[in-house]
Amino acid sequence: MATSSLCSSFTSQTCNPHSRPHRKTLTLPGSVFLCRQFHLNSPSVSKTRRIRTRQSGPVASLGGLLGGIFKGTDTGEATRKQYAAIVNTINGLEPKISALSDSELRDMTFASRERAQKGESLDSLLPEAFAVVREASKRVLGLRPFDVQLIGGMVLHKGEIAEMRTGEGKTLVAILPAYLNALVGKGVHVVTVNDYLARRDCEWVGQVPRFLGMKVGLIQQNMTSEQKKENYLCDITYVTNSELGFDFLRDNLATSVEELVIRGFNYCVIDEVDSILIDEARTPLIISGPAEKSSDQYFKAAKIADAFERDIHYTVDEKQKSVLLSEQGYEDAEEILAVKDLYDPREQWASFVINAIKAKELFLRDVNYIIRGKEVLIVDEFTGRVMQGRRWSDGLHQAVEAKEGLPIQNETVTLASISYQNFFLQFPKLCGMTGTAATEITEFESIYKLKVTIVPTNKPMIRKDESDVVFRATTGKWRAVVVEISRMNKTGRPVLVGTTSVEQSDSLSQQLKEAGILHEVLNAKPENVEREAEIVAQSGRLGAVTIATNMAGRGTDIILGGNAEFMARLKLREIMMPRVVKLVAEGEFVSVKKPPPSKTWKVNEKLFPCQLSNQNTELAEKAVQLAVKTWGKRSLTELEAEERLSYSCEKGPAQDEVIAELRNAFLEISKEYKVFTEEERKKVVAAGGLHVVGTERHESRRIDNQLRGRSGRQGDLGSSRFFLSLEDNIFRIFGGDRIQGLMRAFRVEDLPIESQMLTKALDEAQKKVENYFFDIRKQLFEYDEVLNSQRDRVYTERRRALQSVNLQSLLIEYAELTIDDILEANIGSDAPKESWDLDKLIAKIQQYCYLLTDLTPDLLLNECSDYEGLRSYLRLRGKEAYLQKRDIVEQQAPGLMKEAERFLILSNIDRLWKEHLQALKFVQQAVGLRGYAQRDPLIEYKLEGYNLFLEMMAQIRRNVIYSIYQFKPVLLKQDQDKMENQKSGKRNARPPTDTNPDPVGTVEPSTSASS
């Protein structure tokens, strides 16, 4: 389940201490801010820069606080030298590889695959493989990977993290090591942060390995198990981090081999690795099942929370995201609910009231979630996207639904869970790439054992990161932001404004409307999400103003002057989609996740740089008519049509006649648009390039750097500036008393603050937020490590039961160990023979297995001379009883026993593992208090968790063998009539269930008597 945080973070900037200070005056006619001046890069700030140092990274100061992280850091030249020899070898192979025909190039794959599978090392195959991929990319995509991209590929092949700047072609880089590592035949996973990027990368750069004879697969959320299995078996599979993790958990809940979809783990390339392994690592992946809860309690608690007042009835700790009822709060709640104790275990009102107050104070609409229809949808704080299908756990989501007056969905109980840390550590070889990893080198190396390597840029980065501007109050900050946007807009420079919430983006949008500034908004709201790629791709056009809620993982480059190819695709899409996408018939089932295509696909004409010529309009019409004739009028689903359009809008040869015609039209339209976008690009560059405005610091500096990195791609001109307020969440929550003192000292809202004390206070706040969230991730990892070893054991046992053809040996082992448990519980190993209570022992054994009716004290005394003899004899009888029961069932219903055994093992593992997870959650909450008794909570958790685990594994064995011993097939009359068919191998019996009697086989209640 996803959780959300109200905290933001910020970044330090390294500036030239010798730069000449300059003064800028920002004014907006008609504003309260009229004629107010604020001075940037003042001499006092420059002095501060000279004296402030940080051990952990770049110099921090007010005049560049949290600014350009890239200045003064490793430029990757050492990496360039390290790999220079191999790059030269690859370049030396280029003439030879270029001379090969397409089929000869494809044959290189088969030859390399054969060599790899015979044991030749991938390192020795690397130069040739990279040269082949480079040539294929040139032929298929029209892109020749630069030398620095080859270096990036080699870094990934070594199992390291490659830090590559935005716009350096990370998507293409991933193909190089993916192709090389796929040669061994064990599969490669390329992991992205969302479905859109997975599909885009598979359809675009996936053409390269496909052209070279490899199978490339794509996993999407709405696929069937069969489709997923087929795609996971491909040489290279594109998939999102969450879908891969959930498929792993679902595989470990499967009840038949046919339901398994994932092949074994081999090599994994993670795009935006910091977002996945750092930002999302605080929240484990959880698959939940429904649990019965009364919705009335949520609504009553919501009314109480609404009536209660902060600091009177309760206090709020925004840093810990917790609330605490005061004495008056307890008394008033108990009086309203007419209960004696909020913590009465029969009703447990306390959790409902606490969650209701959390929903009121800490989980805010259009910040942490949005409302769509009658659903509360979580907004990912790192990407600004809606997290479809994700819910907060422990009743919190229901509390938010009650607050909003929406229908309450059932509370959930955890069926399976895993942290991203432990999930990805299952890969024998793991690597990743991002534009912002340097800030988290320590965490990558300590938890994941991944080295971070800086890859040099192809062209020098010349973006100018301006000084940060800090105000006392948010009102002054937002006025200054509007002034900045207006000033840039007048020069024609495109502006990208980053906000941290939907609420902020809507508020700023309203202010820009009042100022008469045309703009686009990109946030989690449905009407904006649909146009995401369109909005981002055109953010670099002359005079464009774009407000975006977080830019992590957006995946679309902002090209100065506009993206001609993207516009050409939109034009072709506008013409084609209405004619080939089928309409949903009335009454036909429509997926909630995929609404019917009621839209027209019509694009605002202002988006296109020019009116399309008649010649290209006719070319597009002709291609679309051929598509309609070949595919059928309105015969495709929207997803199918989008996939075919994607294939059409690529470069390189196409075998299919329709795709070839559409591709030709796309290329011609692109050429026409490029004439205009190139002219516009020159104007944008002359104006200064893309200007990025940050409005608040996130808790992760990397997200701020990703926002900055949208400007200055591939050596483009650009600039960035952040506007901050002491009322921003990061300073308010983590700033401490010093920030509060500064807020009282500086009374003027509209003037920026310059103070060495402030610089130090903000620097400390930054360290606090980074350390705080690192500690959370580290603690989650440490606690999940305990669970991970248990999870591995349980999943191994479960997979053994699922995939074994014959479970006889496993069941005999269960029978013998259960007999051992009963014996040890009733007769001590050191007890003399004369003191054995055999009547009690026999009663307990016969309670488990009614077949052992012949056991008597005299028989045991005669057969067994000592304790070990007794153990061996009872083990033998337990085994014989199991084999006897197996024969009885097989005679009545051939083949049923195998199904019953598998079903009973899987169902008991799943049920008891679910209960174990709940128990561990309570243990983790309880051990936290033991720190006050000078006891390490983690060690306490390990000890108690281990004891609970041993008891759970024993209980699984006992329940299963008890159910097997008690199992009595009940045949229906038609089954008796068809006994002959059953004996010949045709079975009409269904597997038993552990709850309700089955028409064919029933299992007695498996609440086995405790030994």
Swiss-Prot record:
Membrane disposition: Peripheral membrane protein
Superkingdom: Eukaryota
An MF annotation (GO) of this entry: chloroplast protein-transporting ATPase activity
Biased composition (Polar residues): 1-17
CDD domains the record matches: DEXDc_SecA, SF2_C_secA
Keyword Signal: no
UniProt xrefs under PROSITE patterns: SECA, SECA_MOTOR_DEAD
SUPFAM superfamilies: Helical scaffold and wing domains of SecA (SSF81886), P-loop containing nucleoside triphosphate hydrolases (SSF52540), Pre-protein crosslinking domain of SecA (SSF81767)
GO CC entries: chloroplast stroma; chloroplast thylakoid membrane
Cellular localization per UniProt: Plastid, Chloroplast stroma; Plastid, Chloroplast thylakoid membrane
Region: Disordered, residue numbers: 1-22, 976-1011
One Pfam family hit: SecA_SW
Transit peptide: 1-59
Main location: plastid
A GO biological process held by the record: protein targeting
Stated family: Belongs to the SecA family.
HAMAP family: SecA
PANTHER family: CHLOROPLAST PROTEIN-TRANSPORTING ATPASE (PTHR30612:SF0), SECA INNER MEMBRANE COMPONENT OF SEC PROTEIN SECRETION SYSTEM (PTHR30612)
Protein's job: Has a central role in coupling the hydrolysis of ATP to the transfer of proteins across the thylakoid membrane. Facilitates the transport of precursor proteins from the chloroplast stroma to thylakoid lumen.
Protein name: Protein translocase subunit SecA, chloroplastic
Native source species: Pisum sativum (Garden pea)
